[in-house]
Amino acid sequence: MLEYISSLPKQPISEEEKEGLIEMREEEKLARDVYLTLYNKWKLQIFKNIAESEQTHMDAVKYLLEKYNIPDPVKNDSIGVFSNPKFEELYKKLVEKGDKSEVDALKVGATIEDLDIADLEKWINKTDNEDIKFVYENLMKGSRNHMRAFVRMLNNYGSNYTPQYISKEEYEEIISSSTERGMNR
């Protein structure tokens, strides 16, 4: 993916596009950090696998930050450490909830992907840069796949998930559709 992104032109970037990249870098880190923490607690393979995917999402956004000479908000890559206090608070809240049971942990995973999808949709609508849109669209495919995986696991536990950030209709469409592949260009 990085090879393709590097082939796209560097376009003028707005303050809003910069803000989106900074926010998504830390939001992808939030996902990775929560999943690693929950993996250490529950040893459910899904958390380890998706944390690895979140690392590639972080790397793709970092590549764009470097491409556009935007300072990386991830100054300290330690788990649970964020530049933006909102992500530090969210990390603590989500880990506390996920610490209660395996089902709660899986619901936390679905919640993170729910938030990710909503935020990516917001930022996609605020950018016209081809490379940024491409990365966001691929991150969104990943988030939809992750949501499907968490919901499948919840169903295996006899539980389910109610969306908090995206519409019920969008959620139903996501979980009833097939796994998506990245890099469609």
UniProtKB/Swiss-Prot annotation:
It comes from the Archaea. SUPFAM superfamilies: Ferritin-like. Transmembrane segments: none annotated. InterPro entries: DUF2202, Ferritin-like, Ferritin-like_SF. Pfam families: DUF2202. CDD domains: Ferritin_like_AB2 (cd01048). This is Uncharacterized protein MJ0754. It comes from Methanocaldococcus jannaschii (strain ATCC 43067 / DSM 2661 / JAL-1 / JCM 10045 / NBRC 100440).
